[in-house]
Amino acid sequence: MRDLQVISRTYPSGFKAKVIIRPDFYKKFMGIIVDFGGSDPQKLSGGAHFLEHKLYAKKSGDISYKFENLNASTNAFTSYNETMFYAEFINHWRQVLPLLFELVGTTYFTEENVTKESQIIAQELAMYQDDPSWQVNHDLLQKMYPNTKLAEDLTGTQSALNEMNPDILKDIYQKNYYSENLEFVACGGFTVGQAKNILIEVGKLQEYYFSQNNKKIIKNPPTLASATKDTTIKGDVSIPLVGVGIRFPSLLLMAKKLGLNPTELQILLQMMLQIRLGSSSSWFEAAQRREVINSPLSIDVTYTRQGSFATIIGASNKPKKLIEEIKLQITFGQILQSSFNLQKKDYIARNIRELDQIDDLAIEEAELALDNEKREDILNKVQTISFSEFCQIYEKILGESDIFTTILESEV
């Protein structure tokens, strides 16, 4: 595994920055990540995502055009616990850097531009809601984490979009966009000298644009799952869609008990579910022959501050049979050491490939930094964990988990 050359700095304000030097690449990346996302406390659902969109609006117009004039592209995303803004480019880092800070560090909210954005996001939400996989995933989350932001789409709800206004956006911004809640990352073909100069400029820019507040601890009171574990819903599908959700215990608390970090647990859980239910599992091949399943399952394990869960989604003309078999596999599925070793090799190979994907590498490094986690520590754990420890960890977590199911059938 190749070591990354990284130069880091923490400023007196608490703002953190790092430059990852990849000397053999022309491409460059700069981003600012915010330790705040869609499932964190906010007055209206979708507030974090709405704010992400509106930060591109400035008094002079859409700031994206300024990036384009430098032959740079800019984008952003909102996830459950973070928001990130970034730019990709080849040249002109000295011009791109202050633009990025202007993007994240200044606001321009008006009744007119907020109303217009509400209409745009409403169309985005409607598009998601028409997707059968979204419908199944949404129904599972409604049962696993009812009456929480996790149970609502990151884009919000129609009622929340109707209520959004400049004052609410200003409140979200002021509470979450401050020095100690932000981190900067650059990655790509920079020299050591350029990296040091970037960190000098970042120090000036963060001091100019962001206020200094003490880091706020986000409190997430425990939530109860729904008493209803199995539902059937109707939708526009030709083949029934099946969803199985696993609500895990707190991965943060479990990680402390097991001497791991939450990301390591997330990876190990993903590996186990792939071994038991993935396209290379013995079960999948047999299920295909028996026409229980049409195509590979979508398997995702998610860790958030508000709760952690897995969703397993697939299509089948025998939906009840598929659910029955998935539940059996989750609990009693065959685990071969050879499959475990293959999953480890696959994870290591993906890590190595990611080192050559400048944007993916930078985003993951920024995300890990927010949780005070390191890539090399996680990789070392995956490499060194024994087969027996792997199985014991899974059984321990599964023993404290609940399983929920959804079947999406045709309306006809």
Where do the language-model regions lie?
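His/Glu-rich zincin catalytic helix
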Residues: 1-63, 170-286, 385, 393, ...
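Charge-rich, well-structured scaffold segments of protease-associated domains
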Residues: 63-214, 258-260, 280, 285-412
